[in-house]
Curated annotation (Swiss-Prot):
One of its GO terms (molecular function) is serine-type endopeptidase activity. InterPro entries: PDZ, PDZ-like_dom, PDZ_6, PDZ_sf, Peptidase_S1_PA, Peptidase_S1_PA_chymotrypsin, Peptidase_S1C. This is Pro-apoptotic serine protease NMA111. Keywords: Apoptosis, Hydrolase, Nucleus, Protease, Repeat, Serine protease. Coiled coil: none annotated. Residues 79-269 are annotated as: Serine protease. Its EC number is 3.4.21.-. Nuclear serine protease which mediates apoptosis. PANTHER family: PRO-APOPTOTIC SERINE PROTEASE NMA111 (PTHR46366:SF8).
Length: 985
């Protein structure tokens, strides 16, 4: 696993406002946001501690080290490495796989203490590795609503070779100057021991930024131990072997670390041990510790300061109100800047006192005294229940997760704790591609959704495939309400479930809410299509009537294409039958939703009817009866464009604005788009057109047309290596055979010579052994370009007689090969039985002319995927076969979830699974047969092969509750995709 410095969960850094140092929490979470940390003035020790720290000069350094060695040897048996997955995005936390540390605090009950940001607020699965490398599953039994600690539970009877012991918690031993050790899983290592000295006991909780988890209303302990990712949850121990604090965070630019005091942990542990509820009270107010001089400036009277300094001689400040949540118990009572004097008559100087009173007063009325403007102000306030305003359930629908807005999120902006929070803005509710967090839903389908239950009731009434209006806002900008239309997808994302936390089992139980409602009938719509603003050419102006925008939404990764919405210009090929041609970068396969829009007024569904394996175009079909608009079938040219020809570019800019420009062809060349790091569809073996116009670089799609309105070429965008976009023209003559077959009511099929080609100069051809008579023939017959076509690669095949890299193509079936399109393949229909035919190639290989019979092949598109352990598996698609010389298995990994078991245990994208439990898995059928026999929550052995043919093996534990095995298969007759659940929990 890659180790990064993050929130001491291997975590992300955050910037300190005053010291300009970045803070981190110490575990293995590589996906957290960054922000600032408030740094205060150094204070003295707590008021009940002795200021003078004795210096032990009587013991030698040797004796001290020996004592530490003895202590550490005992402590390490209580420390565990936690490997975990936060399964689903929830509240402030993203879905992730990570590592952290914990330590045993009750060996009999099997209770492990770790951080709250490790346990997480949402679904969790994990296991603990003990000092002797025994492993045991852990379940979460408590996560504090505010403070950064939680408890995991394991079954001690499952451990056979180690006798675990618990660390004793003694928070009172934490003193300034004390030498400590942090024993944990630092930087992802099995065991690290870091030393340091406590420098502060009264630091405010570090602030890790907005829209992420932050502790508050507690003091933190500060020390210099230089802990890093993976040490979250480590015990901070004294030389006597007592745990005095819990490692939580630190600075990534300094050696400073932040520890959580254990006072509230001790109380919570006692409640768990005695099977009592852990009550947590709140008045929905955040307090911060401020020094006396600042308190005076905020309104603390001199008498109150004098009294506080006398009563708490070790303290240098008091608690001041920082944020009061609207509609909370203290709203319109406490004000920002108020200095807290007492609660129920008890003078207050620390957060621990506040927690003690609130936690024991849930539902009761308390009397609070604050100072404001040098005057005492007293009021009564009813203590609320923190657990009630902490979400314990969420809804999954349309590929997104929702729950009630949490106290944790609302506190950042002093908002009321209410509303429907979007935990994962994905699927239908991908509200803003640039911002994925912080969204709150206000209205759906013109119905208000103030609570999660209201949201559920509204979603129950919405049919599949309906477009509804959603009003929403972001927590960072509550003044701005945004409006968008959402396509309700209940066919790709069929689940409509509610998950509820079960603290007894540690599992989030789910139940199905309702089945999807069938789609409503689509009614024809009318639209006006405006002419292009070309006053001197009415025929060109009418070309807008043949153009549309094709929209695609990919629901699941297939062929290594990530699920995301795309759109681009389409050309109507046949207005009566509804055929539209579009770049394959917008329609990469047919496991998606496709729509066609006209004049930015009508949007109708479409289906994929043809995908060209190499030429980078797709053809979709919509129902023309649904479009009441003057859509026109254009005239396609019969002659090819040549270099120097004048033409007109008409295309859609990235904003979907239609523009046009006079231009000319400045080149026609051969092109194969370079491979991506992860193989995916790419255009190969094309004859492409380039034009003399900068406007083409601003348009991802369009057409080239003659002055009389005849379409000469399709302007396409191709995805290349490292997300680079290639823009080029494809002559319409190259697509006419396919178009004619479709217009005739048949299904086109293409059979190709499956190899990679490129052009070489006559000089290179002569050097590599092409006979002079062939060079002379090329010079005589070629008019525009003098070149030969050479083989650059050979796709994976079992056919023995094949082209080899370096071959120079002289002729095919006796015809001189002058350009790439001369070896473009055979176009036919699905009725043709001989579409895969043999072609007679004459090539130069190793400076010798030889004849080859090369069989053309049909490229099969993907029709089946399997999701196992959160990993999407399929047969290797064509892009993989184009670059591989051997295929180890037909079980190929194209994607894995950010919280998946596949990621946790080490299945990489582009791996091949060759064996499961030592049984060969040459194909998906065999793979499914084997994994069906693997019980839930058990280990299986996987043997894999990397893309570079390096074999390795891993073990993986199944979890069918969160990661079921699912098959998605295309029905060859209807073209629809059917989901089948393979595993049962």
């Amino acid at each position: 696993m890659t180790v990064e410095l993050k929130r001491n969960l291997l975590e992300s850094s955050v910037e300190d406002i005053d010291l300009e140092s970045k803070k981190q929490r110490v575990d293995n979470d590589v996906d957290q946001n960054t922000s600032s940390v408030d740094e205060d003035i150094d204070y003295e020790e707590d008021y009940d501690e002795v200021n003078d720290v004795p210096i032990d000069s009587g013991n030698s350094l040797f004796n001290n080290n020996a004592k530490w060695q003895e202590t550490i040897s005992k402590v390490v048996k209580s420390v565990v490495s936690i490997h975990f997955s936060q399964v689903a995005p929830f509240d402030s936390e993203a879905a992730l796989v990570s590592e952290a540390t914990g330590f045993i605090v009750d060996a009999k009950l099997g209770i492990i203490l770790t951080n709250r940001h490790v346990v997480g607020p949402g679904p969790f699965i994990g296991y603990a590795i003990f000092d002797n490398h025994e492993e045991c599953d852990v379940i979460p039994i408590y996560r504090d609503p505010v403070h950064d600690f939680g408890f995991l539970k394991f079954d001690p009877s499952k451990l056979k070779y180690i006798e675990v012991t618990a660390l004793e918690l003694k928070p009172s031993l934490a003193k300034v100057g004390s030498e400590i050790r942090v024993v944990g899983n630092d930087a992802g290592e099995k065991l690290s021991i870091l030393s340091g000295f406590i420098s502060r006991l009264d630091r405010n909780a570090p602030d890790y930024g907005e829209l992420t988890y932050n502790d508050f209303n507690t003091e933190y302990i500060q020390a210099a131990a230089a802990a890093s990712g993976g040490s979250s949850g480590s015990p901070v121990i004294t030389v006597e072997g007592y745990a005095v604090a819990l490692q939580a965070g630190g600075s990534s630019e300094a050696s400073t670390d932040f520890f959580l005091p254990l006072d509230r942990v001790v109380r919570a542990l006692q409640c768990v041990q005695t099977d009592k509820p852990i009550t947590r009270g709140t008045i929905q107010t955040q307090w911060v510790l401020k020094p006396f001089d600042e308190c005076r400036r905020l309104g603390l009277s001199e008498d109150r300061e004098k009294e506080a300094r006398k009563r708490f001689p070790g303290k240098t400040g008091l608690l001041v109100a920082e944020a009061i949540l609207r509609e909370g118990p203290a709203y319109n009572k406490v004000q920002e800047g108020d200095t807290l004097i007492s609660i129920n008559g008890t003078p207050i100087c620390s957060f621990i006192q506040v927690d003690n009173i609130l936690d024991s007063s849930v539902g009761d009325e308390i009397i609070i005294v604050v100072q404001r403007g040098s005057k005492d102000i007293s009021f009564r306030c009813t203590v609320g229940d923190l657990h009630i305003i902490t979400p314990s359930r969420y809804v999954e629908v349309c590929g997104a997760n929702f729950h009630e807005l949490s106290y944790q999120m609302a506190r950042c902006y002093a908002l009321p704790v209410k509303g429907v929070f979007v935990a994962s803005a994905t699927g239908s509710f991908d509200l803003d591609p640039k911002e994925k967090t912080g969204w709150v839903i206000d209205f759906v389908d013109n119905k208000e959704t103030p609570t999660l239950d209201d949201f559920i009731e509204v979603m129950k009434t919405i049919p599949d495939e309906k477009r509804v209006i959603v009003k929403f806002h972001n927590l960072t900008d509550v003044q701005t309400q945004r409006i968008t239309s959402v396509y309700i997808d209940r066919h790709w994302c069929s689940e409509f479930r509610i998950y509820t936390r079960n603290d007894k089992t540690g599992i989030w139980d789910y139940e199905k809410i309702t089945e999807k409602l069938p789609p409503l009938p689509i009614k024809p719509q009318k639209a006006k299509i405006l002419d292009l603003p070309i006053n001197d050419n009415k025929k060109l102006a009418k070309m807008s009537h043949s153009l549309c925008v094709v929209h695609s939404v990919i629901a699941i990764t297939m062929d290594s294409m990530e699920p995301e919405p795309t759109n681009g210009c389409g050309l109507v090929l046949d207005a009566e039958k509804g055929y539209v041609i579009v770049s394959r970068s917008f329609v990469p396969h047919d496991c998606l939703n496709t729509f066609v829009s006209f004049a930015e007024s009508i949007l109708v569904p479409a289906k994929v009817v043809f995908l060209h394996p190499t030429q980078n175009y797709a053809i979709v079909q919509y129902d023309p009866s649904l479009v009441d608009a003057p859509v026109c079938t254009p005239v396609l040219a019969n002659e090819r464009l040549e270099r120097g020809d004048e033409t007109n570019f008409i295309g859609y800019m990235y904003s979907n604005t239609l523009i046009s420009s006079k231009t000319k062809v400045n080149g026609i060349s051969s092109l194969s788009v370079p491979n991506d790091i992860i193989p995916r569809y790419r255009a190969t073996n094309l004859e492409v057109i380039s034009i003399d116009s900068n406007i083409s670089t601003k348009c991802k799609s369009g057409i080239l047309a003659a002055d009389d309105g005849t379409v000469r070429a399709i302007w396409l965008s191709c995805m290349g290596n490292k997300e680079k976009l290639y823009l080029m023209g494809l002559d319409v003559v190259d697509i006419k055979e396919v178009v004619d077959i479709l217009r005739a009511g048949k299904n086109p099929k293409v059979s190709i010579v499956d190899a990679g080609f490129d052009s070489i100069s006559l000089l290179q051809a002569r050097i590599r052994g092409v006979p002079e008579e062939w060079i002379k023939m090329m010079e005589e017959e070629s008019e525009n370009r003098l070149q030969f076509i050479s083989v650059t690669r050979n796709s994976y095949t079992t056919i023995k007689e094949r082209l080899e890299p370096g071959d120079i193509i002289l002729s095919v079936n006796g015809k001189l090969v002058k350009r790439m399109r001369d070896i473009g393949g055979v176009v036919g229909t699905d009725d043709d039985t001989d579409i895969e035919s043999e072609l007679l190639f004459k090539v130069v290989r190793d400076a010798k002319v030889i004849d080859l019979k090369i069989k053309t092949v049909q490229i099969e598109e993907t029709t089946r995927i399997v999701v196992f352990a959160g990993c999407v598996l399929q047969a290797p698609h064509h892009a993989v076969r184009q670059v591989k010389t051997s295929i180890p298995s037909e079980v190929y990994a194209v994607s894995r979830g950010t919280s998946s078991l596949a990621l946790q245990y080490g299945i990489e994208v582009t791996n091949f699974i060759t064996h499961v439990n030592d049984q060969s898995t040459p194909d998906l059928d065999t793979f499914l047969k084997v994994v069906k026999e693997i019980p839930d929550n058990t280990y299986c052995k996987l043997r894999l092969m990397t893309f570079d043919d390096v074999p390795f093996a891993i073990s993986l534990k199944t979890n069918y509750h969160y990661f079921p095995t699912v098959e998605l298969r295309k029905n060859p007759k209807t073209g629809s995709w059917i989901e089948n659940d393979i595993s049962e929990t």
